[in-house]
Amino acid sequence: MKKNMYYAISAPSGTGKSSLIKTFLNTNLGMNFRLSISHTTRNIRSEEIEGKDYFFISKEKFKKMIFEKKFIEYTYSFNNYYGTSFKEVKNKIKSNFSLFFDVNYKGVKKIKEFIPKLISIFILPPSKLDLLKRLYNRYNSNEFELNKRFYKYKKDILNYNKYDFILINRDFNNTLNKIKTIIISKNKKAINQIDKINETIKKLLKK
């Protein structure tokens, strides 16, 4: 039986995390991986598919699942709940798949209690300007939404040094290849360029 691997990827909104995960899953290396599908209470978007992107449920049902301790981890963000259920993860593990988790740092900590060998990857934007452009395009210049997302992004990156690997997404294909390298070699020194990352963090945290 093959040895399964478990990876959590975190990133501020608009950094390209979801696209990187989806593209990786369609590569030869990604064939043995599955994405752990989260539950959420937010509305489904036109391009999304129930059970593939998320399990979309009501807030009442989500709260019931919290009460019944059915989540490994959950969070409340921008007026909606998001969570990883024990059932989803156990079913994927039982099917002998390696797993990707799309969660924030608190989620990483909780999942690591359940799966100690979880490896965490944090993805940063190349610059604050680049991130603002992506957020602007995504949220149609809604100033209130932009400010909320940017405030959360500054909180997200404060935990960057608690991850196993840190990548700066300057180029999509290059970042994708680095994720593959992490999975193949798990060589931290080959990936983390600490001085460059620290300098990027300082710039990203500037007002």
Swiss-Prot record:
SMART domains noted in UniProt: GuKc
For this entry, the protein name equals Guanylate kinase
Q: Would you identify the family this protein belongs to, as annotated? A: Belongs to the guanylate kinase family.
Give the location in the cell. Answer: Cytoplasm
The record ties this protein, via PROSITE patterns, to: GUANYLATE_KINASE_1, GUANYLATE_KINASE_2
Q: Which gene encodes it?
A: gmk
Which species does the entry assign this protein to?
Wigglesworthia glossinidia brevipalpis
- What is the top-level taxon of the source organism? Bacteria
This enzyme catalyses:
GMP + ATP = GDP + ADP
Guanylate kinase-like domain boundaries: 4-184
**Example of a GO MF term:** guanylate kinase activity
Q: Which Gene3D superfamilies match?
A: Guanylate Kinase phosphate binding domain, P-loop containing nucleotide triphosphate hydrolases
Q: What does this protein do?
A: Essential for recycling GMP and indirectly, cGMP.
* HAMAP family linked to this entry: Guanylate_kinase (MF_00328)
- UniProt keyword list: ATP-binding, Cytoplasm, Kinase, Nucleotide-binding, Transferase
Task: State the taxonomy lineage.
Answer: Bacteria, Pseudomonadati, Pseudomonadota, Gammaproteobacteria, Enterobacterales
Which residues does the annotation say bind ATP? Answer: A11, P12, S13, G14, T15, G16, K17, S18
Gene Ontology CC terms:
cytosol
Protein EC:
2.7.4.8
CDD domains (alphabetical): GMPK
Mostly located where? cytoplasm
